[in-house]
Curated annotation (Swiss-Prot):
It is found in: Cytoplasm. Homodimer. This is Chaperone protein DnaJ. Transmembrane segments: none annotated. CDD domains: DnaJ, DnaJ_C, DnaJ_zf. It holds the Pfam family DnaJ_CXXCXGXG. InterPro entries: DnaJ, DnaJ_C, DnaJ_domain, DnaJ_domain_CS, HSP40/DnaJ_pept-bd, HSP_DnaJ_Cys-rich_dom, HSP_DnaJ_Cys-rich_dom_sf, J_dom_sf. Participates actively in the response to hyperosmotic and heat shock by preventing the aggregation of stress-denatured proteins and by disaggregating proteins, also in an autonomous, DnaK-independent fashion. Unfolded proteins bind initially to DnaJ; upon interaction with the DnaJ-bound protein, DnaK hydrolyzes its bound ATP, resulting in the formation of a stable complex. GrpE releases ADP from DnaK; ATP binding to DnaK triggers the release of the substrate protein, thus completing the reaction cycle. CXXCXGXG motif repeats lie at residues 157-164, 174-181, 200-207, 214-221.
Length: 387
């Protein structure tokens, strides 16, 4: 199946701005996110398609290539065929005026023909994303909480404000490349003589030189910092949920925007409750007599103890629902339920009075006590031997 146009995937027109692309991605990612569409294979595929489109369109380099060549820019074949160059003589032709077409020749001859790569080296670049694994308790996941975390990340140097130059000075235009970040080199190849561009070896492609570096960042413009960040955990999160903190990742190069910080949540299990989605399960041990006669019991919930009337004749394995006593739905809209699973306990040891009472119960029920005693050494005698 042919791939859909990446702009179409995000609901955009070709030439959309970076901000439009980012807004469209957030909207579509939220629409098709697996957490919102559990078990929906179509939504899962759409979510993957949206991420693939955004991965290309958010990157200036990839976006430029896609705008020019479409999917062929990334399918490995490049979409270009048609024989070799047999006998072609460039005759000193300068490919630097051919824009993106020069990028194709760059892979063959090592330099840049279009100059695009070096110019992009000067441009602000988005910083890398970070991930932090956060452990929280069962109760914190149910009700939400605030957690302070400590991370180490790259930030702009506060002394030089990201310029890399000592306070009171500023970077100078590179005298070798005149600020372009690239120099032209004539190369002799089997195809003839070519004029190509390559990264300036004096400024490293930035177009600037720092004569008096900042003493704090040593001319880099960035420093590593330890930061404490307060993370607000919404009620209802579960293990594997990810909380994005926009702009809290690594600082981008050349004063570019910072990346994002992703908090991956891990919830510790409860000692008494089990969780399935937004519902909570609790095993309540009840005596055989109370299950038969009915009783009012006290049941623990995440909100505190509640009273519940167990009806007479409750059977082992019966589940009772406590409506609204489960986990809040993480996207809002109420809470799940708590289910109380009745575990009827049969006594392992009986005293004489209990034994007689049960025998009396059997007789009242029309059952023969003699039949029980004669089988398997007697029902009650086995309990006595265990004492």
């Amino acid at each position: 199946m042919a791939k859909r146009d990446y702009y179409e995937v995000l609901g955009l027109q070709k030439g959309a701005s970076d901000d439009e692309i980012k807004r469209a991605f957030r909207k579509m990612a939220m629409k098709y996110h697996p957490d919102r569409n559990p078990g929906d294979k179509e939504a899962e595929e759409n979510f993957k398609e949206v991420n693939e489109a955004y991965d290309v369109l958010k990157d200036p380099d990839k976006k430029a290539k896609y705008d020019q060549f479409g999917h062929a820019a990334f399918d490995g074949s490049g979409g270009f065929g048609g024989g070799g160059f047999g006998g072609f003589d460039a005759g000193g032709f300068d490919f630097s005026e051919m824009g993106g077409f020069g990028d194709i020749f760059e892979s063959f001859f090592g330099g840049g023909f279009g100059g695009g790569s070096s110019r992009r080296r000067n441009a602000p670049q988005r910083g890398a994303d970070l991930e932090y694994r956060l452990n929280i308790t069962f109760e914190e996941a149910v009700f939400g909480c605030e957690k302070e975390i400590s991370i180490t990340r790259t930030e702009n140097c506060e002394t030089c404000h990201g310029t890399g130059a000592k306070a009171g000075t500023s970077p100078k235009t590179c005298p070798k490349c005149n600020g372009s970040g690239q120099i032209r080199v004539q190369r002799q190849t089997p195809l003839g003589s070519f004029v190509s561009t390559t990264t300036c070896d004096q400024c490293g492609g930035t177009g600037k030189v720092i004569e008096d570096p900042c003493p704090d960042c040593k001319g880099k413009g960035t420093v590593r910092k330890n930061r404490k960040i307060t993370v607000k955990i919404p009620a209802g999160v579960d293990t594997g949920n990810i909380i994005p903190l926009r702009g809290q990742g690594e600082q981008g190069a050349n004063n570019g925007p910072a990346g994002d910080l992703y908090i991956r949540v891990n919830v510790a299990p409860s000692k008494i409750f089990r969780r399935e989605g937004s519902d909570i399960y609790y095993d309540y041990k009840i005596s055989m007599a109370k299950a038969a006669l009915g009783a009012e019991i006290t049941v623990p919930t995440v909100d505190g103890n509640v009273k519940y009337k167990v009806p007479a004749g409750t059977q082992p394995g019966t589940k009772f629902r406590l409506k609204g006593k489960g986990v809040p739905h993480v996207n809002g809209g109420g809470r799940g339920n708590q289910y109380v699973h009745m575990v009827v306990e049969v006594p392992k040891h009986l005293n004489k009075e209990q034994e007689e009472a049960l025998k009396a119960f059997m007789k009242a029920s029309g059952e023969s006590v003699d039949d029980i005693d004669e089988k398997d050494e007697g029902f009650f005698s086995k309990f006595k031997k265990k004492k």
